[in-house]
Amino acid sequence: MEQYTKAEILIEALPYICKFHDQKFLIKYGGHAMVNEQARNWIAKDLVLLKYVGINPIVVHGGGPEINRAMEKMGKTPEFIHGLRVTDEETLEIVKMVLIGKINGDIVSKLERYGGKAVGLSGKSGQLIKAKKKIQYLMKDSQKIEIDLGMVGEVEHVDTKLIDILVEKRYIPVISPIGVDHQGNDLNLNADIAAGDIAGAMNAEKLIMVTDVDGIMDDINDQSTLHRRLTISQIEDMIEKGFITGGMIPKIEACINALDKGVQSVHIVNGKTPHAVLLEIFTEEGVGTMIVKE
């Protein structure tokens, strides 16, 4: 690459670096985006660079594929209802083992390998996430039926004090989505929804969903149908028309929730795209879908 071209790329990023200096970005790092070593390296480098140019990334991670593999090794079949994992006591122990015991530490190690300072947390750390058991409903024969998801929670309250301290001390917090109820019971939280709640509580400027798709598309197999910018009302219309289904629905609920709580924009990007986070933030066109309130 010619030297002047490199300079042009850096200069294109300058107004965004100025605009977002000292802002908080919540990065939801999906399990499906952790597909290979190269993709994990790209994400880690992007987050460390953000920190060094004065932006404060806060990571909430998932781990669905690894949890599924661990469950299958132990003879359990993963079960989902509307994109939420049905979680009995044994499944919860597997979830905690994979999220807190493995994935969280792996992400912290990657960030530190590339020059960042990172601290692994869960929602249990410093009473970070207070949760309650989630009640899920399904419609059957025009009747609303309550479904028991087991030890699945929803966020009641996020105490940001610990995250604030770490951010001020130049650390990148890395959070596993396990919450605690008022009786001290652990609850499995959907990582997308937890990320939206934490982003709102932190007054984050952006919520960036790093997943395994390029963004929101009319046809998942046709890159030309990718939407670069959508509003909440447009998103709701797409759900009604069946363009958004399954595991994407909790992601969209998290996006809308974050925007309702004051986050300025939400971005969905593909972690398999080299340096997708940097390209989405620091270029005019971006590489994914940006969602705004209106």
From Swiss-Prot:
Residues marked Transition state stabilizer (site): K28, K251
InterPro entries, alphabetized: AceGlu_kinase-like_sf (IPR036393), AcgluKinase_fam (IPR004662), ArgB (IPR037528), Asp/Glu/Uridylate_kinase (IPR001048), Glu/AcGlu_kinase (IPR001057), NAGK-C (IPR041727)
Family matches, as CDD domains: AAK_NAGK-C
GO function term, MF aspect, one: acetylglutamate kinase activity
SUPFAM superfamilies (alphabetical): Carbamate kinase-like
Catalysed transformations (reactions): N-acetyl-L-glutamate + ATP = N-acetyl-L-glutamyl 5-phosphate + ADP
Subcellular location: Cytoplasm
PANTHER family: N-ACETYLGLUTAMATE SYNTHASE, N-ACETYLGLUTAMATE SYNTHASE, MITOCHONDRIAL
General function of this protein: Catalyzes the ATP-dependent phosphorylation of N-acetyl-L-glutamate.
Similarity comment: family membership: Belongs to the acetylglutamate kinase family. ArgB subfamily.
Protein name from the UniProt record: Acetylglutamate kinase
UniProt lineage: Archaea, Methanobacteriati, Methanobacteriota, Methanomada group, Methanococci
Gene from which this protein is expressed: argB
